[in-house]
Amino acid sequence: MAEAERPAGKEYTTISEVSGPLMVVEGVEGAKYGEVVEVETPTGEVRRGQVLEARRDAAVVQVFEGTSGLDTTSTKVRFTGETLRIPVSTDLLGRILNGRGEPIDGGPEIVPEDELDIHGAPINPAARKYPSDFIQTGISAIDGMNTLVRGQKLPIFSGSGLPHNELAAQIARQATVPGEEEEFAVVFAAMGITHEEAAFFRREFEETGALDRAVLILNLADDPSMERIITPRIALTVAEYLAFENDMHVLVILTDMTNYCFAPGTRVITASGDVVEIDEIVERAAETAVDGGLREGSTEVTVGVTNVRTLAAWDGDLTSNDVVAVEKIEAPSRAVRVRTRSGAELVVSEDHKFLVDTEDGPRMVEASELKSGDELYSVRELRVSEKVPTYLELLLEAEDKFYVHPTEEFEEAVAERYGSLAEACREKELPYRAREAKERRYYELSEFARLATAVIESVDEATEYIDYVTAGGRKRVKFSSPRPGKEVMYVAGLIASDGSVDTERGFVMFSNTERELLSAFEEIVTEEFGVDASKTENQNGVTMLRVNSRVLARVFERLADPKTVLKMPRELVAAYLAGYVDGDGHLKDGKIVITTADRERAGDLQLLLKRLGVPSVLRERDGAYDVVVTGHDAAELAEELPLRHPKKAEAAASMSSGRRSSRFDRVSRRFGRLLREVRRKYGVRASDLGSSSTISQIESGERRATRRLALEIVERLEEVVGDVEEVRELRELAEGNYVLDEVVEVETVEYEHEYLYDVTVVPDHTLVVENGIITSNCEALREISAAREEVPGRRGYPGYMYTDLATIYERAGCIRGRKGSITQMPILTMPHDDITHPIPDLTGYITEGQIVLSRDLHRRGIYPPIDVLPSLSRLMDEGIGKGKTREDHPDLSNQLYAAYAEGRDLRDLVAVVGEEALTERDRKFLKFADEFEQRFVKQGRDENRSIEETLDLGWELLAILPERELKRVSDELIEKYHPKYRQKKEEQEE
């Protein structure tokens, strides 16, 4: 949409709610659907949006650039009174626009001939002219078997990794209405594509000259997702102007967004600090699904709602997102395994997108396009909702029976509240042990908790009323505080690394040879819990300390688990890691290495390190796993860990000298390019910022700046040019909450599971998974529906999606009295080749057929991999035959279809019984099917076949079969077009 002078309108600051990409503005008068809105942020930035819903006294506004940074108090919303319009002109031909309709090709400003509402209107059925004119695409499988007709809506159903982009570009280059070539134009709109895809389309159109008669509209994957809702409408508005105001025949090609899914077992990090496998989130949410849950053996997905909030990025830092919908999808046969330098390993669908670093900054790239050396964005410091559990909470979660022996003050407080202890027990329906002496009276832990809630305000206070806790035996545990502190968490780290917990037999053990660690363990356990440890020594001189207590066994079962520690404050995480390093780590050569025998435990330790802002590498060796921290990160970690092992503490103290950088110190490639732009814009010399050669190498990409060097450059730049926007962006790149994790291996693998899983999160559409990798999900229509809290339809899409799609597709057609026409070919990438996915499924109901791309044909090297059997053009009969293509076209197409179908059936039979069991007739049909695919379906990417060439090729293939088998073609047509008779006729004429 072109920039225009800001229109006058009513301004409001009465925002009551911000949800995903939407905001609710109260007290609005006279707002109308589709009205353009300007949103001014607290920093003065102006964003654009439109009214999605107008109520009596409120309006729901969809913000195109997203709602990040908006608040409900100081954000201003201006209702312009205008609908979303774009300037149109025949000068748009040959131009490249972004998803908002703004030129991005560096060409001259477009002088508008008119301004049109992008929502337009479907063609009035009474004014429609029935489509009947052939459009030649130059592709035999379409022209010969599934003919495109002027004014038709004919979608292409594809899948991830199939060459739909190449096919779309070829159709755009070659398509024409025979005899009216000068009046034919293409409007090509791509939504949610990668930069590589955008570069491909630009190159294809520019180098072949096709751009001269085309308008190219590109919405990139890292553009605001809300643009994807308006991009196809902008494309159709341009097409309507060219068709119905300038008498052109316009082919509109629309590419669609994809879906992204994970393998089960992928670990998702939640805002509460839990690490939950994605399939667990989906299955748990499905229990509350609106239509009864996930049905086994079906690709139909039920949408559930969950209270899970995930960590999300990317706007330079972490946020939290609501999980609003879930999916469980039958898995494809293939997936992509991605391994990174840090040790992260993910198995995802081929179209799943990761946040990758480039010279232009972060952008989303599909897994199938990743390559070794790419750098993925990962979180440097995990920030979660912190919580330290009380000892009572830890014990209440266990199945064991524990007994609380209260203080006298407890029963006095209960009696004061209820009149007597007996009355309190009756009201709470608890047993009253009247015969027991007060000093021997006890309560089961759950009983005590129920009584305590009546006389205390917090769980912490309950500990004050506890004398001691037992597990039914004599071993008493006295808690010195309600919750574990740094000392206890240090012991938990010792136990996790070099100890054990046995909840069955009820003991905790720690073994080591270092006296300082043994003493620390004994002293802390005695001081914090009032228990003693027994000591033994084995034949190797290793001292083993054992605490016999079922109570402490249950406490340390939880506290020694890194997943529990992940939610705790930074100082407790550091204390735990100090115990772990003292017990089973070593410091040497500027590295800190923590060793474990368990792969999952190693991943948990990496997450704990990221709670401290420390990235690490996971390495496997001889059945063990090392978590390694190097460079500046190791030195900073050494300073923060309260180590007690004498030698390790000494090594940590000396680690601050001779610090070296690691790969995780690198800043984004964007830093160098932006630095050069800033220097040129403000006339800053390289020598003003440091070594000229260093600055030059960073700007050219020869050298990568470390975080520290980048920050030094930024600080010097601030002294020279001040606090300007570009320098603020450089600072964000220098000290942002990210690390770059290099991809070391990408491989296509056979998928081993039955299902893939997906969650829809709003508003940021990203998840933090595994050890901090940032990855994507969500589709725009589903996002809006979730943000509006609408009753979800299939797979999280709104129930009105059929209507929404129809408002796009029904803008195609021919109008009586108008020469021009609009033909649509939307391209839909079916998630996991699932034709029942809501978008292709509903598209099939609205449109007039479909072209289906085959993964099997693609694997066999056939381009374009069009499977003609499930493909269909419902208007084909109206656009072919005598006077349109050729008289033999209808019968020839039917015969080719029937023969190919029989050949395909025989191919399946051969797989069972072998070719030897076939008759001679069967072998001819089998040969026909092979030749049909290799000669008719397959053609060059630049091969433009005329309809005559396509039909003649069809007759050549039918010559493989006996004439008696050509039952769908008349004898007259056989005598006229069959190669045998045509050859005789040509010989006679000669």
UniProtKB/Swiss-Prot annotation:
Q: Which domain of life is it from?
A: Archaea
Q: Which Pfam families match?
A: ATP-synt_ab, ATP-synt_ab_N, ATP-synt_VA_C, Intein_splicing, LAGLIDADG_3
UniProt's post-translational modification comment states: This protein undergoes a protein self splicing that involves a post-translational excision of the VDE intervening region (intein) followed by peptide ligation.
Q: Can you cite a GO biological process for this protein?
A: intein-mediated protein splicing
Give the UniProt subcellular location, in the record's own words. Cell membrane
Could you tell me the membrane topology recorded for this protein?
Answer: Peripheral membrane protein
* Cellular component, GO annotation: plasma membrane
Q: Which residues form the DOD-type homing endonuclease domain?
A: 491-614
Q: Where exactly are the transmembrane stretches of this chain? A: none
Provide the alphabetized UniProt keywords: ATP synthesis, Autocatalytic cleavage, Cell membrane, DNA-binding, Endonuclease, Hydrogen ion transport, Hydrolase, Intron homing, Ion transport, Membrane, Nuclease, Protein splicing, Transport
- Molecular function terms, GO-annotated: ATP binding; DNA binding; endonuclease activity; proton-transporting ATP synthase activity, rotational mechanism
Describe the function of this protein.
Component of the A-type ATP synthase that produces ATP from ADP in the presence of a proton gradient across the membrane. The B chain is a regulatory subunit.
Q: Which family does this protein fall into?
A: Belongs to the ATPase alpha/beta chains family.
Q: How does it assemble?
A: Has multiple subunits with at least A(3), B(3), C, D, E, F, H, I and proteolipid K(x).
Q: What is this protein called?
A: A-type ATP synthase subunit B
Organism for this UniProt entry: Methanopyrus kandleri (strain AV19 / DSM 6324 / JCM 9639 / NBRC 100938)
